[in-house]
Amino acid sequence: MIRISQLKLPITHTKAQLEKKIAKTLKNPGNSFTYEIRKQSLDCRHKNDKIFVYTVDVTIRDEQKLAKKVNNNNIMLTKEKPYEFPSPGETPLLHSPVIVGSGPAGLFCGWYLAKAGYCPIILERGEEAEKRQKTVENFWKNGVLDPESNVQFGEGGAGTFSDGKLNTLVKDPYGRNHEVLKRFVAAGAPEEIIYQQKPHLGTDVLVGIVEKMRHEIEEMGGKFCFRSKVTDLIFENNTLKEIEINNDKRIPAQVCVLAPGHSARDTFEMLQKRGVYMEPKSFAVGLRIEHPQEMINMDLYGEPENELLGAASYKVTHKCANGRGVYSFCMCPGGYVVNASSEPGRLAVNGMSYQARDSRNANSAMIVTVTPEDFPDKGVLGGVEFQRDLEKKAWELGEGKIPVQLFGDFCKNQASEALGEVTPCMKGEYILTNVRSVLPKAVGDSIEEGVRAFGKRVSGFDREDALLSGIESRTSSPVRIVRDQELTANMAGIYPCGEGAGYAGGITSAAMDGIKVAETVCRKYAAIKNN
């Protein structure tokens, strides 16, 4: 196989033009070939000459001879190494492995274990995706919160109500990233996510994908139990024996994959009581910021709209004078700010986009790093307490509604009384107030400095009527459930997994970690179906 990089074409190019470019690069006017796009990125440095840059893998006769003949630094011989799931181990499994949580980590762990014959049981505290969607929409419309099935909990995890970004910075020598993307495509995602620089799915597409993955897992011998919150783990001699569900039913368990999500605070409390080792970790908190999507498009594309490219995105970071980092997070082009609360009397927000990314606003979190030093002497769950305190203040400030403030008023530390040209795109009720009043001083100062700095990079970013809303507190897990080289906790049979356990950040990396844990379980234990 020959890999060609730096193939540059206008954004209006056709498939035939790409194929012609490949043939010309290989100096191959006649021989037939097949190709697969490995990467597509956008170069907008010249607004009037926007281009796509491709990396493609080409299969053609006499590849070695051809590669030497062409003598081009952008051409190299390569050999694709397909992903391989390990063969089963020999230790007998007396009971089906139990997976706690059906977010990306739990779903992918479950899918691969089911395919290998392990008949996993997946316990999910929330509802099936279709029921959960109705519950969440009712919450946004009527303010009735279900603490067990909401934006954070339920089939698909917190990522179901997000932009559905699939890019990751995790190094992947084993091919798990590509495997995750292929699995999404097989479940209904568009094929372009395989090679796009910034692939995304959107909430509307994600719901259908997780439903299909559930059905596939069930067809392969897996079982789902919804409205089934794990309330206790029973150990004997530091070894898992049983799992308690809903403070009532107990099931025997030998293997438990813990993939509870980053908001499973009651689960973290239970683990602490049971002696499972955890450690506090750094995370970030802040606010959402909204701008007109056309403004962001103008800055990147040089035009307010481009049908070929869709809504533009940005990624910005800044090191503040106080030493803290402030940066954009979970940027949602053409998206919505959503009420993402999961606990009564507390309020959190998140960003969400549908696949079309066609709302009038762009939004992103403006978040500031916090470390365990910001909540000293609070113990392992100090970060949880820190989050809860901010969310309680936000709920009280907005009387249960999303608190919103214009950036100009934020800088003056005064309540907003009227909107400017930017009007909110939100799911859930909002109220104008002084959002800054709920933030720690260091966080508020950092956001103000950061937005000012970003205004020098993205024209209009620091406009007075940009909208800030909060609080964005669920960026990542505030704890890490400690695991060893065998991916097990200090209690035998427990496999911490995914974002909630502190080993991922986003849909793709969580799914990859789910596969990684499934591999580990498989290497040790014999499959159920073969017993």
Name each model feature, range by range.
Residues 1-52, 56-531:
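Residues forming the flavin
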